[in-house]
């Protein structure tokens, strides 16, 4: 038995080394959000294969606390669009995927097996949401590796109550992410990212000085398109565009209220 285990380990190591040589990471380095898609259907076999592979993501206790609702029909996309602020890609993408934190399925399994579930609480929602988001990112990476384009819609948690109603989500199921998917019909400029040293912390978190912030955000603030945003919005700094225009406190507080209400409605909060 020891010899068999050793042989299996050696084979696994060889496979990993082979895979490492073959993997081309350029698609990740060059990735960008795609909002315009060709009117070309995604084969169900491909979509199902990508989702099945995505489900290999890490999951709490191997419970797989997520479900995915696939939307293809134009009338269903039209119903979802207002919940996503009528962003055009919701209705023009061949496929819209709603990833949900789901303790409904697992809880029903428990009850069917003489076990009493206790997952109607915030910590359970966070665990299920983490599972769902890990799967979401896994799917996005796999989809892009197969030549598809994706757009991550942050609006899902802004209007979860509407999505719950439209998709008929039962108790202990909560939408946490929406992805539009299709074959790209555009090649937009790649968005900027903060420098590595602005994000990494060795051993402990090192809080930022004003000088650190100046250095980390210098390139972002110097970009012509970002300077244009400042000008057209009649603001003094790029940060003000975020705080005063794009992500305002009043909006955040209102949507937080909707989120809390929906979590309670779906059984994750008292």
Where are the predicted features?
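Acidic, surface-exposed loops and disordered segments
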Residues: 14-270
């Amino acid at each position: 038995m020891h010899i068999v285990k050793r042989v299996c380990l050696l084979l696994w190591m060889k496979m990993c080394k082979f895979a490492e040589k073959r993997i081309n990471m350029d698609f990740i380095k060059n990735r960008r959000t795609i909002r315009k898609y060709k009117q070309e259907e995604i084969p169900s076999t491909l979509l199902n294969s990508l989702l099945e592979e995505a489900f290999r993501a890490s999951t709490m206790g191997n419970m797989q606390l997520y479900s995915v609702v696939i939307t293809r029909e134009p009338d269903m996309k039209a119903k979802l669009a207002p919940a996503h602020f009528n962003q055009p890609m919701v209705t023009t993408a061949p496929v819209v995927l709603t990833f949900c934190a789901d303790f409904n399925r697992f809880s029903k399994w428990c009850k069917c097996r003489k076990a009493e579930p206790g997952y109607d609480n915030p910590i359970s929602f966070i665990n299920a949401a983490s599972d769902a988001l890990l799967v979401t990112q896994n799917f996005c990476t796999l989809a892009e590796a197969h030549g598809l384009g994706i757009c991550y819609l942050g609006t899902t948690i802004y209007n979860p109550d509407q999505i719950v109603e439209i998709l008929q989500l039962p108790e202990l199921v909560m939408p946490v992410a929406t992805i539009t998917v299709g074959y790209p019909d555009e090649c937009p400029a790649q968005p900027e990212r903060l420098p590595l040293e602005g994000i990494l912390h060795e051993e402990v978190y090192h809080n930022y000085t004003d000088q650190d912030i100046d250095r980390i955000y210098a390139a972002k603030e110097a970009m012509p398109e970002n300077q244009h945003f400042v000008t057209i919005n009649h603001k003094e700094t790029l940060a003000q565009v975020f705080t005063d225009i794009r992500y305002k406190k009043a909006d955040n507080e209102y949507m937080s209220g909707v989120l809390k209400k929906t979590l309670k409605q779906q059984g994750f909060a008292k």
